[in-house]
């Protein structure tokens, strides 16, 4: 081959075209032969896996020599073509194109050579645990393979074998790197599956090895740096750090942020640093932000020193790796979750519950700033302000939100508590809240000055007849203890609003309004069944609603001049809620009254219309019905005793007794025939009602004070006097009936109509001339 090239180069003058074509053909055949041998060798090595190292080296030498010959011949041809272009341009061009095709084939063979060399060097580096060098050789082989794939004329079967070989070797080095990583970063967990208990935290450890156990003699950098840099070269560093970051967050950082008694302990030993936990007793229910920041800083500083502060920007054979610091990479991966954890488990619980403590929160804001600055110095964070600091600085909004949330939660708990636990309200009762702050001193002096002037100018403007001091007070009654606490909560919240910022004051004010809206919706629904079945609870609920409505009348006015200016233009009012609460209480009590009326009428329906009282069975049924009615009324009187205000109590009992009496009157006046015995027995039943009826009026627990209301029965029972007249008629003669009618002017005429009186006379007396005369007088 060398003599052939020498002969071509030594030839002087014009080359013979036939001779040149023959030589190029020979060269082409030789290229094809070498190509076949190389492909055969590659196929055997990467597809058939046969040892062929010596033949491969010989082929490499032949390829190099042949490449040099082609370059010399190509140069000579170009020279001859330029000299004799006008003679045989087309022929020389064809020869040149054929030669260029041969050059392409040779370049592909060179790429195969470089691929094979890179794989061989990779294997050597992997054997010597030079992971960075091995990773770089794999990347070189990857580039060679990519270039080969870009040539469509190459054998696809060989490319497939090479690609598979490259994949296998990459997974191989990643496996070895993973093993080295597990030796350098060792997690120790408790045997139990529960990893969220304090006991499991105390058994969790992280071991950071600064050197490998089998230290190599010639290592260009610390082993952990070598492993990380190799991961970086292979493009796997991000996923490896992300996995480490998630475990760090789950097993180290989150427990420190959520458990106040947990503290990190750093143990330094030869070639190893251990991060573990210890428990220190504390009375804190939630961790202090400043303490949590200190704990996390300690852990991150250790990681920064032992793991994250390693150079990844070294140029190795012109192969530049990532210049982003490891700390910043890890920070980007876990900071969002870490800051959310710090907010939910730490900062949220540090928000004050009282506006007077807001000033103390500046310390927490300052510690948050210091924490973030420390992380920025470690390059764990970038320069931008994070959500953590924004959350801490937005304390006014968070305080208002938390306060409002706490108020609503407390209010709802009170609304869903038992209604029957009551307290007595008297006209002098007051809400247990601190005194409201006085208005501005200047305004106070001005008011006093005007008042003194008017006092001296006008001697006495007080009217002769004054109202009672309790005219506008809520009457004595019993309300639920929970409702009293609910009103105290409303007053305390508004009092808090008077010393808060404008934004917070507005939120607190509307939270108080929301309390009453919530009461309107929750209580009737939550206690629906009891309010329907138990008359005492219905009465208490009625009082509760009236009590709230009573306070809502003046609640806004009391705080009007002390709230934020935006609320002082008339919006700070609760008067619009008053009708709704009055209606709520009234409807509930009226529904109970309707239920009681229904029971009374149902009992009286078993009296067999009070007819044929001479029949013992009928009389017994009527007597039983009357006694059941009286018993029901007495039981209601006891249930409502000392609960309802006296006037409401008397009206309610009077209405129910009036219903029963009206039914009795209606049944008796509807009878067509009443014998003497019937009349006597009906009179006896009516007398029972007349004697025991007033006893149901017992609004007060002291029996001596109830006599007044029992004597006023006719005031509350409209049918009481007609009932007495009915009793009189059952025992009276025709003459007595006529006298009480008194030409339509007597008490009987006031109680019954003429038709009703006539019907009773016809039922009571036989048809005689005297009866006819008596009927004639009834007009």
UniProtKB/Swiss-Prot annotation:
Sites of N6-acetyllysine modification: 777
UniProt cross-references to Pfam families, sorted A to Z: ZW10_C (PF20666), ZW10_C2 (PF22766), Zw10_middle (PF20665), Zw10_N (PF06248)
Cellular component terms per the entry's GO annotation: cytosol; Dsl1/NZR complex; endoplasmic reticulum; endoplasmic reticulum membrane; kinetochore; kinetochore microtubule; lipid droplet; membrane
Gene Ontology terms for molecular function: centromeric DNA binding
Tissue expression as described in the entry: Widely expressed.
Domain of life: Eukaryota
Compartments, as annotated in UniProt: Cytoplasm; Endoplasmic reticulum membrane; Chromosome, Centromere, Kinetochore; Cytoplasm, Cytoskeleton, Spindle
Region (Interaction with ZWINT): 2-81
Modified residues (N-acetylalanine): 2
Coiled-coil ranges per UniProt: 14-130
GO aspect biological process, one term: establishment of mitotic spindle orientation
Keyword Electron transport among UniProt keywords: no
Phosphoserine modifications at: 3, 12
Region (Interaction with RINT1): 2-317
Keywords: Acetylation, Cell cycle, Cell division, Centromere, Chromosome, Coiled coil, Cytoplasm, Cytoskeleton, Endoplasmic reticulum, ER-Golgi transport, Kinetochore, Lipid droplet, Membrane, Mitosis, Phosphoprotein, Protein transport, Transport
Topology versus the membrane: Peripheral membrane protein
Family listed: Belongs to the ZW10 family.
Misc: Overexpression as well as silencing of ZW10 disrupts the morphology of the ER-Golgi intermediate compartment as well as the Golgi apparatus and slows down ER-Golgi transport.
Quaternary state and interactors: Interacts with NBAS and KNTC1/ROD; the interactions are mutually exclusive and indicative for its association in two different vesicle tethering complexes. Component of the RZZ complex composed of KNTC1/ROD, ZW10 and ZWILCH. Component of the NRZ complex composed of NBAS, ZW10 and RINT1/TIP20L; NRZ associates with SNAREs STX18, USE1L, BNIP1/SEC20L and SEC22B (the assembly has been described as syntaxin 18 complex). Interacts directly with RINT1/TIP20L bound to BNIP1/SEC20L. Interacts with C19orf25 and ZWINT. Interacts with ZFYVE1.
Cited function: Essential component of the mitotic checkpoint, which prevents cells from prematurely exiting mitosis. Required for the assembly of the dynein-dynactin and MAD1-MAD2 complexes onto kinetochores. Its function related to the spindle assembly machinery is proposed to depend on its association in the mitotic RZZ complex. Involved in regulation of membrane traffic between the Golgi and the endoplasmic reticulum (ER); the function is proposed to depend on its association in the interphase NRZ complex which is believed to play a role in SNARE assembly at the ER.
The name this protein goes by in its record: Centromere/kinetochore protein zw10 homolog
Species of provenance: Homo sapiens (Human)
Name of the gene encoding the protein in the UniProt record: ZW10
């Amino acid at each position: 081959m060398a003599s052939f090239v020498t002969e071509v180069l030594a030839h002087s003058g014009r080359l013979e075209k036939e001779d040149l074509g023959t030589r190029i053909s020979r060269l082409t055949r030789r290229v094809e032969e070498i190509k076949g041998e190389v492909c055969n060798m590659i196929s055997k090595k990467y597809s058939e896996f046969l040892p062929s190292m010596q033949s491969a080296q010989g082929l490499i030498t032949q390829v190099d020599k042949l490449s040099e010959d082609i370059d010399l011949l190509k140069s000579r041809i170009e020279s001859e073509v330029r000299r004799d272009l006008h003679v045989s341009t087309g022929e020389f061009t064809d020869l040149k194109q054929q030669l260029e095709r041969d050059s392409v084939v040779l370049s592909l063979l060179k790429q195969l050579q470089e691929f094979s060399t890179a794989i061989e060097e990779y294997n050597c580096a992997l054997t010597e645990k030079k992971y960075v060098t091995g990773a770089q050789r794999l990347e070189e082989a990857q580039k060679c393979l990519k270039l080969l794939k870009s040539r469509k004329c190459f054998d696809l079967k060989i490319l497939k074998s090479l690609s598979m070989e490259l994949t296998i070797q990459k997974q191989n080095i990643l496996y070895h790197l993973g093993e080295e990583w597990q030796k350098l970063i060792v997690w120790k967990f408790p045997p139990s599956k529960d990893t969220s208990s304090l006991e499991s935290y105390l058994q969790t450890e992280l071991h950071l090895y600064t050197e490998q156990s089998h230290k190599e003699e010639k290592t260009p950098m610390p082993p952990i740096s070598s492993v990380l840099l190799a991961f970086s070269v292979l493009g796997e560093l991000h996923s490896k750090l992300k996995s480490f970051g998630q475990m760090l967050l789950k097993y180290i950082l989150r427990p420190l942020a959520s458990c106040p008694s947990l503290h990190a302990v750093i143990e330094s030993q030869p070639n190893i640093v251990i991060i573990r936990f210890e428990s220190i007793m504390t009375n804190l229910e939630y961790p202090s932000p400043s303490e949590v920041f200190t704990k996390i800083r300690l852990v991150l500083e250790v990681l920064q020193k032992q793991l994250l502060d390693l150079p990844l920007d070294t140029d190795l054979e012109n192969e530049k790796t990532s210049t982003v610091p490891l700390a910043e990479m890890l920070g980007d991966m876990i900071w969002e979750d870490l800051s959310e954890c710090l907010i939910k488990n730490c900062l949220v619980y540090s928000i004050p519950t009282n506006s007077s403590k807001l000033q103390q929160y500046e310390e927490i804001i300052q510690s948050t700033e210091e924490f973030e600055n420390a992380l920025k110095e470690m390059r764990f964070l970038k320069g931008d302000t994070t959500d953590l600091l924004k959350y801490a600085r937005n304390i006014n909004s968070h305080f208002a939100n938390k306060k409002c949330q706490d108020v609503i939660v407390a209010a709802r708990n009170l609304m869903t508590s038992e209604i029957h636990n009551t307290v007595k309200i008297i006209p002098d009762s007051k809400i247990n809240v601190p005194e409201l702050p006085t208005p501005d001193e200047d305004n106070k002096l001005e008011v006093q000055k005007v008042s003194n002037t008017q006092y001296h100018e006008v001697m006495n403007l007080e009217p002769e007849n004054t109202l009672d001091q309790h005219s506008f007070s809520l009457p004595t009654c019993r309300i639920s203890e929970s409702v009293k606490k609910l009103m105290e909560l409303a007053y305390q919240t508004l009092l808090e609003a008077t010393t808060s910022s404008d934004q917070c004051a507005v939120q607190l004010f509307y939270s108080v309004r929301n309390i009453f809206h919530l009461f309107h919706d929750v209580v009737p629904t939550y206690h629906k069944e009891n309010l329907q079945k138990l008359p005492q609870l219905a009465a208490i609920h009625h009082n509760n609603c009236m009590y709230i409505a009573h306070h809502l009348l003046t609640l806004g006015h009391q705080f009007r001049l002390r709230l934020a200016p935006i609320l002082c233009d008339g919006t700070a009012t609760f008067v619009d809620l008053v009708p709704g609460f009055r209606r709520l209480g009234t409807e509930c009590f009226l529904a109970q009254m309707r239920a009681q009326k229904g029971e009374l009428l149902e009992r009286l329906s078993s009296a067999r219309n009070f007819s044929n009282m001479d029949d013992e069975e009928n009389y017994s049924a009527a007597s039983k019905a009357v006694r059941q009615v009286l018993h029901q009324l007495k039981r209601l009187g006891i249930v409502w005793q000392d609960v309802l205000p006296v006037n409401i109590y008397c009206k309610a009992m009077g209405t129910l007794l009036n219903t029963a009496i009206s039914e009795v009157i209606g049944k008796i006046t509807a009878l067509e025939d009443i014998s003497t015995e019937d009349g006597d027995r009906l009179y006896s039943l009516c007398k029972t009602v007349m004697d025991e009826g007033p006893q149901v009026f017992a609004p007060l627990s002291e029996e001596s004070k109830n006599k007044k209301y029992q004597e006023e029965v006719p005031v509350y029972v409209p049918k009481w006097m007609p009932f007495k007249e009915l009793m009189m008629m059952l025992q009276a003669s025709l003459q007595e009936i006529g006298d009480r009618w008194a030409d339509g002017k007597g008490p009987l005429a006031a109680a019954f109509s003429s038709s009703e009186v006539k019907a009773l006379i016809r039922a009571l007396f036989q048809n005689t001339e005297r009866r006819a005369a008596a009927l004639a007088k009834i007009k």
